[in-house]
Curated annotation (Swiss-Prot):
ATP-binding as UniProt keyword: no
GO CC terms, sorted: cytoplasm
Organism of this sequence: Clostridium botulinum (strain Kyoto / Type A2)
Recorded metabolic or biological pathway in which this protein acts: Amino-sugar metabolism; N-acetylneuraminate degradation; D-fructose 6-phosphate from N-acetylneuraminate: step 5/5
Family matches, as CDD domains: GlcN6P_deaminase (cd01399)
Name of the protein in question: Glucosamine-6-phosphate deaminase
Active site (record annotation): 67 (proton acceptor), 136 (for ring-opening step), 138 (proton acceptor), 143 (for ring-opening step)
Name of the gene encoding the protein in the UniProt record: nagB
EC numbers for this chain: 3.5.99.6
Record-linked InterPro entries: Glc/Gal-6P_isomerase, Glucosamine6P_isomerase, Glucosamine6P_isomerase_CS, NagB/RpiA_transferase-like
Function per UniProt: Catalyzes the reversible isomerization-deamination of glucosamine 6-phosphate (GlcN6P) to form fructose 6-phosphate (Fru6P) and ammonium ion.
Length: 244
């Protein structure tokens, strides 16, 4: 695990974008695992700038998003499909057929989850997975005490996650209580992982994930066992880390 501590959110975003750009430039048909939320927005903004300078080509890239709220249609501004279209996909030359995001309105969730795993396998697995980390140590929507053997599945969101995500909605009551998420096993099979975190609110989770014991109670702690993880965090998120 390589840990890069930067001064601020902007620097974190630029470093992450540079790594993603390198991945796509070196392997134009890369399979990218993508995250949503506040943390990666700056990275996507930087990626768009790199693309506009004609240094990236997304025409052969395939993407798989980590998760999607259950019960939100793709036109809902709070859906992660809407987020991805408006923060990245509408601004680059990606083939829309190569975009994969769980269907939060699927009639048969079990079939949807199995099909998502099948698509990842058919694509050859994920070359580079982008992750954020929740205040409770979750990655994707894999909440504490999730099995490390889990694949794509329907998740019951816990109170901390609902509370944290309520800032994106008009009220806490509007936050979906379930989501479809790639599982820990799905994530850990990625060839390379970049974990992003910014701000003091993430410092406990970052410290436990990196310095603590490997436990399902802190889902991100499993990343200690992965052979190629880069953690890019600002000073505040790193404030409780033991870097010796």
């Amino acid at each position: 695990m390589r840990i890069i501590v930067v001064d601020n959110y902007e620097e974190m975003s630029k470093k992450a974008a540079a790594m993603m750009a390198s991945q796509v430039i070196l392997k134009p048909d890369s399979v990218l695992g993508l995250a949503t939320g506040d943390t990666p927005i700056g990275m996507y903004r930087e990626i768009i700038n790199i693309y506009k300078n004609q240094k990236m080509d997304f025409s052969k890239v395939k993407t798989f998003n980590l998760d999607e709220y259950y019960g939100l249609n793709r036109g809902n501004p709070q859906s992660y499909y809407y987020y991805m279209m408006n923060n990245l996909f509408n601004y680059v030359n990606i083939d829309k057929n190569n975009i994969n995001i769980p269907n939060g309105m699927a009639d048969n969730i079990e079939v949807e989850c199995k099909e998502y795993e099948r698509k990842i396998d058919k694509a050859g697995g994920i070359d580079l997975q982008i992750l954020g980390i929740g205040v409770n140590g979750h990655i994707g929507f894999n909440e504490p005490n999730i099995s490390f053997e889990s694949e794509t599945h329907l998740v019951n969101l816990n109170e901390k996650t609902i509370e944290s995500n309520s800032r994106f909605f008009s009220s806490k009551e509007e936050v979906p209580t379930k989501a479809i998420s790639m599982g820990i096993k799905s994530i850990i099979h990625s060839k390379k992982i970049i974990l992003l975190a910014c701000g003091s609110a993430k410092s406990d989770a970052v410290s436990k994930a990196i310095n603590g014991k490997i436990t399902p109670n802190i889902p991100a702690s499993i990343l200690q066992l992965h052979r190629d993880v880069v953690v890019i965090i600002d000073k505040e998120a790193a404030s409780k880390l033991n870097l010796k």
